Swiss-Prot record:
Protein name: Small ribosomal subunit protein uS4
PANTHER family xrefs: 30S 40S RIBOSOMAL PROTEIN (PTHR11831), SMALL RIBOSOMAL SUBUNIT PROTEIN US4M (PTHR11831:SF4)
Described function: One of the primary rRNA binding proteins, it binds directly to 16S rRNA where it nucleates assembly of the body of the 30S subunit. With S5 and S12 plays an important role in translational accuracy.
Family membership noted in the UniProt record: Belongs to the universal ribosomal protein uS4 family.
The encoding gene: rpsD
Subunit structure of this chain's protein: Part of the 30S ribosomal subunit. Contacts protein S5. The interaction surface between S4 and S5 is involved in control of translational fidelity.
GO molecular function: rRNA binding; structural constituent of ribosome
Organism classification: Bacteria, Pseudomonadati, Chlorobiota, Chlorobiia, Chlorobiales
Keyword annotations of the record: Ribonucleoprotein, Ribosomal protein, RNA-binding, rRNA-binding
Organism: Chlorobaculum parvum (strain DSM 263 / NCIMB 8327)
Record-level GO cellular component terms: small ribosomal subunit
SMART domains found in the cross-reference section: Ribosomal_S4, S4
TM annotation in the entry: none
Amino acid sequence: MARFRGSITKVSRRLGIALSPKAEKYLERRPYAPGEHGQSRRGKVSEYALQLREKQKMKYLYGVLEKQFRIYYKKAVAQRGVTGDNLVKMLERRFDNVVYRCGFSPSRAGARQLVTHGHMLVNGKKVNIPSFLVSPGDQIEFRQKSRNLDAVADSLNKAAESRIPEWIQVDKANRKAVFLAIPEREAVQEPFNEQLVVELYSK
């Protein structure tokens, strides 16, 4: 599937959230939108603009393009429960996101590369599809020849224990993890309001 090829830093500044470690550093120095008038943009923001911005946040955070994001939304509507909660849970189950949550990569983009380049296994089988949905009890690990990648070791060394969520159990020494459970919405600490996205698609 095609991926966003533009400047993640500019998008991060426009949305006001860090989409990568590099963007986080830029936001600390320039916490305003890019462009000549970035610091002076004021005025009332329309309801539609707010809803659209929240959708953009979710899409860019999880690295999902519009077509697939809409598919996730339709599936969330069809499921029992709260649509917004269902949407977030599906995004959290994406394989590239789970690899990121494990601390195997400092960013979701990096985690996606690990997956697409064939470095990762699920229950002992190679899975190179970032959108693959991980289920409770699934075991995630590196292929034997990929376990000592320098980038992975560096990421694990920097990953604070507090960053690894409670629904994932990680064995850093052996480059393995277990997806224990699908997280409840309140446990997912991300800077977006999915209810505004539901309102946008419900129009």
